[in-house]
A protein has these predicted regions:
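Mobile active-site "lid"/loop adjacent to the S-adenosyl-L-methionine
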Residues: 109-140
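Dynamic helix-loop-helix/coil hinge segments at AAA+ ATPase domain boundaries and subdomain interfaces
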Residues: 1-8
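Class I S-adenosylmethionine-dependent transferase superfamily signal
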Residues: 21, 47, 122, 144-148
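Conserved Class I SAM-dependent methyltransferase catalytic core
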Residues: 2, 135-197
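Conserved SAM/SAH cofactor-binding pocket of Class I
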Residues: 9, 16-117
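Helix N-cap/beta->alpha junction signal
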Residues: 11-12, 164
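C-terminal beta-strand of the catalytic ATP-binding
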Residues: 109, 198-200
């Protein structure tokens, strides 16, 4: 995938989130999804390339990120299966109610107080809006939990990347009662990195 200034460089552990989604929606099983904070589009496009029965939305608040997503979408000839949407507030997204089978996201999750301590090659060159998750790294997750139940079909899945175990504990305390825990996934270092919920 092509990346450049203004977009997050995909991380290896994010591949595990894609693999998890494909376990629930394997090749040939049709579904409609949203990739929130799509960045370069790598998550959404990887899903579409692996499962030809999927269609999706790639959503981001950054016009620069969406330009890269559009470049990658065109490169992989997936314009007819991935729509791109600029949105900063999940509550205002132009998505029909209960229309999605799953939502997947690698959102900004680094606590604001830890931004200054990031490695220079990350802090100085990658877009802060793709990294800075506000207080405790939880700002966008809170918005997700308020809005996403309205977008997901009953039984729909929410698959999230996180900062790790301590943040997941905080998320479990914040998540809407409309969601049931399905799975937690370890990254390559044995840290709980991803969490999956199902809408009741």
């Amino acid at each position: 995938f092509k990346v450049g200034r203004g977009v997050l460089i995909p991380r290896p552990e994010t591949e595990l989130l894609v693999e998890a989604a494909l376990e629930y929606f394997p090749r040939g099983r049709g579904a409609r999804f949203a990739d929130w904070c799509t960045g370069s589009g790598c998550i959404a496009l990887s899903l579409l390339l692996e499962n030809g029965a999927l269609t999706g939305l790639g959503i981001d608040k950054s016009p620069q990120a969406l330009r890269w997503a559009a470049i990658n979408r065109k490169f992989h000839h997936l314009e007819d299966r991935l729509a791109l949407l600029r949105n900063a507030e999940p509550s205002e997204a132009a998505i029909d109610g209960e229309s999605l089978d799953f939502i997947i996201s690698n959102p900004p999750y680094i606590p604001e107080g830890e931004m200054a301590g990031l490695m220079p090659e990350v802090r100085d060159y990658e877009p802060h809006m793709a990294l800075n998750g506000g207080a405790g790294g939880l700002a966008l997750y809170k918005k997700f939990f308020r809005s996403f139940p309205g977008f997901l079909k009953p039984g729909g899945l929410l698959l999230l990347e996180t900062a790790g175990s301590s943040q997941i504990c905080a998320l479990e305390g914040l998540v809407s009662s409309e969601f049931v825990l399905m799975n937690k996934i370890l990254d390559y270092n044995g840290i709980i990195r991803h969490i999956i919920w199902r809408k009741r």
